[in-house]
Design a protein with these regions (language model features):
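N-terminal targeting leaders characterized by basic, low-complexity, disordered sequences
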Residues: 1-38
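N-terminal Sec-pathway targeting helices
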Residues: 42-58, 68-71
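Sec-dependent signal peptide cleavage junction
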Residues: 65-80, 414, 418-422
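Conserved hydrophobic/amphipathic alpha-helical signal-anchor segments
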Residues: 73-109
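Substrate-binding/catalytic groove segments of enzymes
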Residues: 96-101, 120-127, 374-377, 405-409
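Extracellular/periplasmic head regions of type IV pilus-like filament subunits
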Residues: 102-139, 298, 320
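Long, compositionally biased
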Residues: 137-160
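Collagenous Gly-X-Y triple-helix signature in extracellular proteins
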Residues: 160-422
Length: 422
């Protein structure tokens, strides 16, 4: 009995010993597995750090090589960029020597690139154009007491020559003799028809203009594409003939000429101005920037009175009286010439609205008064010209004249790709 009991206890002890041994082995395996996982994770982290380091070093090497290459390689500038460099160089030169600037608005002078190079205002032209042989100069014109226009001219053999805006428009490839387009007409180059590619804008503005014509002085006449935000009276002075304030159709002393002056200066709808302020009108979109104004010239706006039955289209009637200004309104004859309808004969022919890009849009004022009634002026009404009492209100589409020195930067004349003036 005792032997049996001892055997059972021995077997139980051996069994417990075996179980403890198995548990110990299991715990050891589990710890080893954890250690292996930690080791694998650490090895993976080290590999990723090495890979990340290699990528960073590679980027640094590539960027460093690019920088070193850039130090030893020249940038090739475009011709337009070189013209801008010439212009900036001339501005710097005359900041150093202001007494050399033109003294009057009638005076114009040229400064050659060789002078600008000698004065360290710019480098040799071939530096910018990788050895191309070019010559150039910058013309300086006085615009007002403190404003000057700087116009660069660059010629590089047969490869490139600065293009003036008027020459680009007058190019023979643009001319047509029928249909819509640019006509040689009465000694001028006139856009006629409905769908014509005569859109233009200044390089620093999105405001669109339409090219009306290139006149005999090579000034490009532009009219604002969209009409003004506000409606304005042409004139609302007391008229003795009618004993009321229906206005007088004398442009030189009219309210509209004064309004246009404010419009040109961007002073319509401002809070603190003495007139045409925000109590009367909403603020108009800025007409021209300071830089844009250096590219336009004062012109003789043709403001003579015209009768309803007048059939002339050469401007002789309207231009019998002129008003000098930087901004004006379209003369009637320019509207008539824009139509290619053969039935557009007199001032008020309804057919003049046909095949005429100028007939679109709001009712707008023209520059000319009626030849028969002193309180009536011409406006575009429903697409054609009609007599309107001067004290009525209409929108305006101002005109300006580009200097013959204004340049073409790019563009095709379409609404989406207009000619760009610089």
């Amino acid at each position: 009995m005792n032997n049996k009991l001892r055997n059972e206890k021995l077997e139980e002890a051996l069994e417990n010993d075996s179980t403890e041994k198995e548990n110990l082995e299991f715990e050891t395996d589990e710890e080893n597995e954890k250690d292996n996982k930690k080791l694998e994770q650490e090895q993976f982290r080290v590999k990723m750090l090495k890979l990340f380091g290699i990528v960073i070093i590679g980027l640094v090497v590539v960027l460093g090589l690019g920088f070193i290459i850039s130090l030893f390689s020249k940038k090739e500038y475009t011709y337009v960029e070189v013209e801008d460099i010439m212009k900036d160089a001339a501005i710097s030169y005359f900041e150093e020597y202001p007494k050399k600037l033109p003294a009057t608005t009638d005076e114009s002078l040229e400064v050659s690139t060789s002078i600008l190079i000698d004065n360290k205002n710019m480098k040799e032209i071939d530096h910018y154009l990788n050895g191309k042989s070019c010559k150039g100069n910058v013309t300086v014109d006085k615009i007002s007491s403190n404003e000057y226009a700087y116009t660069p001219y660059l010629k590089c053999g047969n490869d490139y020559e600065t293009t003036t805006f008027y020459n680009a428009i007058k190019n023979e490839k643009n001319l047509v003799t029928s249909g819509y387009g640019l006509y040689s007409y009465n000694g001028e180059y006139v856009y006629r028809g409905k769908n014509v590619d005569n859109y233009a804008r200044f390089s620093d503005s999105k405001r669109l203009f339409r090219i009306v014509k290139v006149n005999k002085d090579n000034e490009v006449v532009l009219i604002q594409d969209e009409s003004s935000d506000n409606e304005y009276p042409w004139d609302d002075r007391y008229n003795k003939v009618y004993d009321d304030n229906s206005g007088i159709n004398d442009y030189k002393n009219s309210k509209i000429s004064d309004i246009l002056s404010y419009y040109y200066k961007g002073k319509i709808g401002l809070e603190n101005d003495d007139k045409y302020n925000y109590y009367e009108y909403s603020k108009e979109v800025k007409f021209l920037t300071k830089e844009d104004r250096t590219k336009i010239v004062k012109f003789k706006n043709c403001v003579g009175r015209r009768s309803e039955n007048d059939t002339s289209k050469d401007g002789s009637v309207e231009c019998s009286s002129t008003y000098d200004s930087e901004i004006g309104l379209l003369p009637v004859y320019d509207f008539l010439n824009a139509s290619i309808d053969p039935n557009c004969i007199t001032t008020v022919s309804p057919s003049c609205q046909n095949y005429n890009y100028l007939s679109d849009g709001d009712s707008t004022w023209f520059a000319n008064g009626s030849g028969s009634e002193t309180n009536e002026v011409y406006s575009m009404y429903l697409g054609y010209i009609a007599n309107t009492e001067a004290s009525e209100t209409n929108n305006i589409r101002p005109i300006i004249h580009l200097s013959e020195k204004a340049m073409l930067e790019k563009g095709k004349g379409t609404k989406n790709n207009p000619y760009v003036i610089r």
